[in-house]
């Protein structure tokens, strides 16, 4: 008589139950993440709008000719760094809005989405940092105009333009910091919970 072996199901690893304290911590961290991302969305949007609308026209006196003036208009496309900052802020705002929608409609994140958010959080943080740093350097050169650079002191002629530009630089730096904190949270969720539970647990 042939022996029939009954296949034994392989032991499955069961995730440990989530304690009430862990659930409360997950909820609090998720709430913090959502607030950070919403603030980053607002700052990126403000940066983009303020820069795009930054335009000023002034009459400039020609040196050596007392009665001769020319009309000059400056806008954000005066320097490629400002155009880069507008693009970076727009991408940051769009990406943040996408993550906010995903986080609101779904209580859990799959591993693939968690990796996607982690990678793009890092990427956009560095893109925003590079854009803000480059724009700040160009703005500094335009405001102080070092003699060795042979630059014109733009801010002495276009004060409102520079003030509006300065406001956009501040909001861009704030958005960079907010993205950095969000990136840290997404890294925590991914690497601490990959083998335990989805990034955002229900409950």
Curated annotation (Swiss-Prot):
Family that this chain belongs to: Belongs to the Casparian strip membrane proteins (CASP) family.
Keywords, sorted A to Z: Cell membrane, Glycoprotein, Membrane, Transmembrane, Transmembrane helix
Spans traversing the lipid bilayer: 32-52, 85-105, 112-132, 165-185
UniProt keyword annotation of Cell membrane present: yes
Extracellular topological domain residue ranges: 53-84, 133-164
Cytoplasmic side: 1-31, 106-111, 186-203
Subunit structure, interactors included: Homodimer and heterodimers.
Membrane topology (UniProt): Multi-pass membrane protein
Name of the molecule in the record: CASP-like protein 2U6
Species per Swiss-Prot/TrEMBL record: Selaginella moellendorffii
Disulfide bond sites: none
One Gene Ontology cellular component: plasma membrane
Subcellular location: Cell membrane
Main localization category: membrane
PANTHER family: CASP-LIKE PROTEIN 2C1-RELATED, CASP-LIKE PROTEIN 4A4
Glycosylation sites: 67
């Amino acid at each position: 008589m042939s022996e029939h072996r009954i296949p034994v199901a392989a032991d499955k690893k069961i995730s440990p139950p989530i304690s009430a304290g862990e659930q409360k911590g997950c909820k609090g961290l998720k709430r913090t993440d959502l607030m950070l991302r919403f603030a980053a969305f607002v700052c990126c949007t403000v940066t983009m709008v303020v820069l795009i609308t930054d335009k000023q026209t002034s009459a400039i006196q020609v040196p050596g000719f007392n009665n001769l003036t020319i009309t000059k208009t400056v806008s954000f496309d005066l320097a490629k760094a400002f155009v880069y900052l507008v693009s970076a802020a727009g991408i940051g705002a769009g990406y943040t809005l996408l993550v906010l929608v995903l986080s609101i409609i779904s209580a859990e994140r799959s591993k693939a989405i968690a990796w996607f958010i982690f990678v793009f959080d890092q990427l956009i943080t560095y893109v925003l940092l590079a854009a803000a740093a480059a724009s700040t350097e160009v703005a500094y050169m335009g405001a102080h105009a070092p003699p060795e650079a042979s630059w014109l002191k733009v801010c002495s002629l276009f004060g409102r333009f520079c003030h509006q530009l300065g406001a956009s630089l501040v909001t861009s730096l704030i958005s960079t910091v907010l993205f950095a904190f969000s990136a840290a949270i997404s890294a925590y969720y991914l690497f601490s919970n990959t083998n335990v539970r989805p990034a955002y647990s229900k409950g």
